[in-house]
Amino acid sequence: MAKLSQDDLLAQFEEMTLIELSEFVKAFEEKFDVTAAAAVAVAGPAAGGAPAEAEAEQDEFDVILTGAGEKKIQVIKVVRELTSLGLKEAKDLVDGTPKPVLEKVAKEAAEKAAESLKAAGASVEVK
């Protein structure tokens, strides 16, 4: 098997959907017995610090479709790209708003998905 360069790999990843990338990461973690969680530096409490202000930053987000707008067909296409849903399931999701499109995804992935849906004319919330 030919060895792929980093640029070749990145080009392949750019062509994948978020769902495909998520499945790839899971398979990679299982194959090599690693986790993709980022290392988090742990800091001690601040001297004279504010009590109970150590609420962790949210790391999982839901992308909620709140309305399809006037370009419903475009929104259905984007929903299908973001998920592994078929045409009927994607249409039902768009028709039944408000509904979650993606659940428990990273902030960056949620923002990208929201941008794609907004560009197609949908109204979206990221929670």
Swiss-Prot record:
Molecular-function GO terms, alphabetical: mRNA binding; structural constituent of ribosome
Disulfide partners: none
Biological-process GO terms, alphabetical: translation
InterPro entries: Ribosomal_bL12 (IPR000206), Ribosomal_bL12_C (IPR013823), Ribosomal_bL12_C/ClpS-like (IPR014719), Ribosomal_bL12_oligo (IPR008932), Ribosomal_bL12_oligo_N_sf (IPR036235)
GO cellular component: cytosolic large ribosomal subunit
Keywords of this entry: Ribonucleoprotein, Ribosomal protein
Main function: Forms part of the ribosomal stalk which helps the ribosome interact with GTP-bound translation factors. Is thus essential for accurate translation.
Assembly, per entry: Homodimer. Part of the ribosomal stalk of the 50S ribosomal subunit. Forms a multimeric L10(L12)X complex, where L10 forms an elongated spine to which 2 to 4 L12 dimers bind in a sequential fashion. Binds GTP-bound translation factors.
Family statement drawn from the similarity comment of this UniProt entry: Belongs to the bacterial ribosomal protein bL12 family.
NCBIfam families: L12 (TIGR00855)
Identification of the protein by name: Large ribosomal subunit protein bL12
